[in-house]
């Protein structure tokens, strides 16, 4: 049976000389892997931009629940993303976020609210012209709202610790190693105040920004079983150096 669905490209890998496997997040089915002919041989009108991380596409697909790899009948661009393709800094952010999404949501079923959050976030990044160095911080921590472990920021005051295991600020040092020290917890509190509208007003040094994303990733390791190391983190760091 054929279905139509919006989708977000995450990454692709070579299958053989003629085919690739493209991993996407679909609105209707959640994360799905599709077998596609490589660009020169494809017959489904796939453009090169389809394979770019975080491309927004519309698909007509076969879908069988027990089949590990599905098939695309037709694909077309849903929303063109010009700056994400041509801006090297934005492209690097896309590579990082696509890997992050694929690892954070690999066990996730279809969730239209989550899909729309990611879709709208990509459009925000497309249209921002400058001052987007905090974008990945906002995106990653806000995604945890849809996964059920967004931190509680209501009780923060200066000098508190941030307990990563429980996602809360506490007065005393937690009896485990997964916490942010009281000297640095103010950064977490600032992070939780940020959104796409106000993120331009929050200034961090390069080292603070590196520390924040490392803490966010550790937070995901603690709360998502199987969440593995993000290989493209070094690429992200390099563009902001």
From Swiss-Prot:
GO terms for biological process: DNA recombination; double-strand break repair. Keywords: DNA damage, DNA recombination, DNA repair. This is DNA repair protein RecO. InterPro entries: ARFGAP/RecO, DNA_rep/recomb_RecO_N, NA-bd_OB-fold, RecO, RecO_C. Involved in DNA repair and RecF pathway recombination. SUPFAM superfamilies: ArfGap/RecO-like zinc finger (SSF57863), Nucleic acid-binding proteins (SSF50249). Belongs to the RecO family. It comes from the Bacteria. One of its GO terms (cellular component) is bacterial nucleoid. It comes from Azobacteroides pseudotrichonymphae genomovar. CFP2.
């Amino acid at each position: 049976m054929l279905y139509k669905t919006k989708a977000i490209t995450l990454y692709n890998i070579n299958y053989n000389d003629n085919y690739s496997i493209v991993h996407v997040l679909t609105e209707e089915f959640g994360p799905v892997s599709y077998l596609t002919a490589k660009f020169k041989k494809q017959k489904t009108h796939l453009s090169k931009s389809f394979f770019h991380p975080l491309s927004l596409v519309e698909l007509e697909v076969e879908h069988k629940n027990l089949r590990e790899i599905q098939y695309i009948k037709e694909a077309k661009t849903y929303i063109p993303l010009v700056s994400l393709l041509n801006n090297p800094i934005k492209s690097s952010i896309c590579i990082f976020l696509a890997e992050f999404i694929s690892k954070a949501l690999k066990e996730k079923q279809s969730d239209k609210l989550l899909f729309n959050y990611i879709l709208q976030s990509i459009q925000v990044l497309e249209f921002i012209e400058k001052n987007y160095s905090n974008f990945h911080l906002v995106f990653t921590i806000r995604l945890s709202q849809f996964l059920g472990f967004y931190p509680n920021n209501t009780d923060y005051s200066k000098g508190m610790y941030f307990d990563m295991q429980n996602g809360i600020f506490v007065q005393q040092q937690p009896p485990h190693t997964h916490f942010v020290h009281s000297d640095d917890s103010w950064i977490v509190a600032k992070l939780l105040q940020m959104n796409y509208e106000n993120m331009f007003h929050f200034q961090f040094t390069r080292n603070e920004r590196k520390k924040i994303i490392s803490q966010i990733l550790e937070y995901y390791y603690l709360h998502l079983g199987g969440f593995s190391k993000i290989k493209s983190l070094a690429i992200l760091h390099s563009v902001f150096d």
